[in-house]
Amino acid sequence: IILTLSLGGILMEMGLITLVINSLVRKLTATWQLIVVTLLSSIGVNIFIGEQFLSVILPGNAFKDSYKEKGIDPVVLSRTLEDGGTVINYLIPWGIAGSFVASTFGVPTLVYLPFAFFSLLSPLFSIISAVTGIGVLYLEEETKKPIIEN
């Protein structure tokens, strides 16, 4: 865990993550595209590094300014990172959570994968929410505070 967090710190300080994300974000035009790319990058970090904390921290730091520029509430970023980062880690055999569950219960990850409904459906619902705009909150223009609707 310490080594992976160190790797994440090095990547952030070198500016590699920000450079890649900024070049990608410039090509995105719609809000739903930003949300889906955030989700996919969080899943990608999970797959390549296998550490759920980095799958939230790296994309979170990289995309937070893009969300603010587009006027999207940080709650949407938080939810997207959760859907693509934390809950997916149980499905990655070499991930921290996946290896813990597999070793604790003695069941390989690929065996319990079809029954992990929440982990499988959460990213799907996040994409549906982004495309339809349901649950996507925006900030007020003047104050950049969350808009609370009753």
Label the model's feature ranges:
Residues 13-16, 29-31, 65-77, 103-110, ...:
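Juxtamembrane helix-boundary/capping and inter-helix hinge elements in multi-pass membrane proteins
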Residues 98-103, 107-150:
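Juxtamembrane and boundary regions of transmembrane helices in multi-pass small-molecule transporters
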Residues 45-83, 108, 145-148:
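Hydrophobic transmembrane alpha-helices that form the pore/transport pathway of multi-pass ion
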